[in-house]
Amino acid sequence: MLGRAFIVAVLYCATFCKADKPTNSSTPRLIILSFDGFRADYLTRFPMPNLDEFMKEGVQVEEVKNVFITKTFPNHYSLVTGLYAESHGIVANHMYDNDTRQVFHMNDSNSKWWDEATPIWVTNQKQGHKSGCAMWPGCNVPMHNVTLNASLNYNPNVTFTERVNNVTMWLTRPNDPINFATIYWEEPDASGHRFGPDDHDNMAKVLKEVDEHVGYLMSELKKAKLWDTVNVIITSDHGMAQCSKDRIIKLNDCIGPGNYTLVDDNPVAAILPLSDTQLVYDLLRNCHPHMKVYRKEEIPERWHYKHNSRIQPLLLVADEGWMITQNHSISMLGDHGYDNDLHSMHPFLAAHGPAFRKGYRMRTINSVDIYPLMCHILGITGLPNNGTLKDIKCLLVNQCYIQIPEAIGIVIGAIMVLTTLTCIIVMLKKKMPSTRQFSRLQFQDDDDPLIG
């Protein structure tokens, strides 16, 4: 009987407890905010009272494993597509397409560079909702013939306050309010490059400003009566490594500049050979002990970074803290782009809102999992991607964490355990000596009879 009750309970939980879509009658609303270059351990190294309050009332992921290369454009596009760089096509901040023979720079607004994937703001609009963007990389580009309902073209002179004010206005406007918005802010990346993440005094100043920005966002959402109804994700694209003017690899010390074109550099360099590829490879392979050289086909599978025409024949990857250039000096003391296994390259994630648990902490997730999470919250059907909701759903409320396939496995396991226990009990009973429950009364001759 107990076994039957257990099985029924498991099946009930698997069938009815899991929330596949948000249950609010109104359209779910979501903001994702990226603070560029926010290294995960900044949270433990610097005081951030506003962000602490935000996470106390919501969830925190201590580290987010981002995609390779750990640069701004590839990772911001991965966040909104759930794809690795080789799949969404924005493989670097600067690119050369070997098929079309065209060059991409960060201010390029030609949709052909972005149309290998579909960002969530386009999917949200195609499924009947409204999207807005405050300077997120790529959102000013009309992708797949879809233009955002509300947007701010990138302009670094627009303050954080102005960006937030626009988003709250878009969310609350009486006609065509949006239900999804992205916000991008340049810090602490700019200061991390300039001073390096180990410069405590200077980084403390900029991170204090970042924390004040979080406080401003919270106060504006409360003022607009959005705090309890809008879901907010705060994250970043990458971390930052400490560098030095003494740790610079100059390629022209190893190979003549006429032998190659440097498509993207520092600290991951994309090389297009202009002469014999094998010769260029051999010269670069022996160039410096702190630089690894890969042919395109030899790039490690774990980076998901080889199957695209915008990835060059040779890839140079510097060790953490080293920088690659052609022949000039570099003044910055912090950089990113390195191996995405490095903790220094990882950002964090914090989230708050009706879809999220309160006071919950998780060790790590993959950045490509954030896309299916956002689709789930918005109640839209996401496009094929490299992420999975399974690994991140515990951040959400109303989740029993047991899906139907998992429940079937548990039920089968429970049946096996109960069957084994039953067999053991039967065997033990057979081995026990037989005793009669009531023995016949034995009368001695001197006993008084019970019946006279």
UniProtKB/Swiss-Prot annotation:
Reaction(s) the record says it catalyses: P(1),P(3)-bis(5'-adenosyl) triphosphate + H2O = AMP + ADP + 2 H(+)
Keywords of the record: Blood coagulation, Cell membrane, Disulfide bond, Glycoprotein, Hemostasis, Hydrolase, Membrane, Metal-binding, Signal, Transmembrane, Transmembrane helix, Zinc
GO molecular function: bis(5'-adenosyl)-triphosphatase activity; metal ion binding
Binding residues for substrate: 93, 154, 189
Signal peptide span: 1-19
Disulfide bonds: 254-287
Cofactor entry: Zn(2+)
EC number(s) stated in the UniProt entry for this protein: 3.6.1.29
Subcellular localization, as worded in the UniProt entry: Cell membrane
Keyword Heme set for record: no
Residues noted as binding Zn(2+) 1 in the record, renumbered to the chain: 36, 72, 237-238
Recorded topology in the membrane: Single-pass type I membrane protein
Cytoplasmic face of the membrane: 429-452
Note accompanying the cofactor annotation: Binds 2 Zn(2+) ions per subunit.
Residue ranges crossing the lipid bilayer per the database entry: 408-428
Positions of the catalytic residues: 72 (amp-threonine intermediate)
Chain ranges on the Extracellular side, renumbered to this chain: 20-407
GO CC, alphabetical: plasma membrane
Family: Belongs to the nucleotide pyrophosphatase/phosphodiesterase family.
PANTHER family in alphabetical order: BIS(5'-ADENOSYL)-TRIPHOSPHATASE ENPP4 (PTHR10151:SF79), ECTONUCLEOTIDE PYROPHOSPHATASE/PHOSPHODIESTERASE (PTHR10151)
UniProt-recorded name of the protein: Bis(5'-adenosyl)-triphosphatase enpp4
Organism: Xenopus tropicalis
